[in-house]
């Protein structure tokens, strides 16, 4: 009955876990919890959106419903996803536009996309990154509209304005980033499908 859930940003890490414990024991998940550590025992929450879990083959099984209901009953809102792969890509659209740029420029969402004098340029660049990522998602069998991609990006930026991406903190503290599972995964999947 043991299952493994990974809420790591990006895509591709589940395959690594599956190669160790088997496909049937791994369920997919995605969460958006914007927070950072202020010090020992002190964490600032900049906002959150519901978490999603699901079977990689699709559909909502009894175990997915049970896990989602248990988390929700303990004040951690979790939704059973019919298509967890699409949910993970939905977050990935935002991550590809927010994480690397936030890390490169060491900026919070507000400074990067809202109060920035070059706001139109940074939002335009973010949109371009998202639309390129969408082309890869479509090639990988994920049916997602342009509006859906941009909605998630805008929702994260607008609801978590004081947040700085985890990638920016990783760079700041000289930790390994999740870039291989975010932009790197998009590049790898794009090459596999011949997307340029």
Predicted regions and their residues:
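Positions that flank functional sites
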Residues: 33, 86, 152
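Generic non-transmembrane alpha-helix signal with a bias for helix starts/N-cap capping motifs
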Residues: 10-11, 64, 130, 183
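Rossmann-like NAD(P)(H) cofactor-binding subdomain of soluble oxidoreductases
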Residues: 1-42
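Proline- and acidic/polar-enriched loop/turn elements at helix boundaries
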Residues: 28-31, 83, 149, 182
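NAD(P)-dependent Rossmann-like dehydrogenase/reductase catalytic/cofactor-binding core
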Residues: 73, 125-196
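Internal alpha-helical scaffold of NAD(P)-dependent oxidoreductase catalytic cores
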Residues: 20-25, 40, 44-145
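Conserved residues at beta->alpha junctions
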Residues: 8, 55, 173
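Short phosphate-engaging motifs
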Residues: 13, 59-63, 99, 163, ...
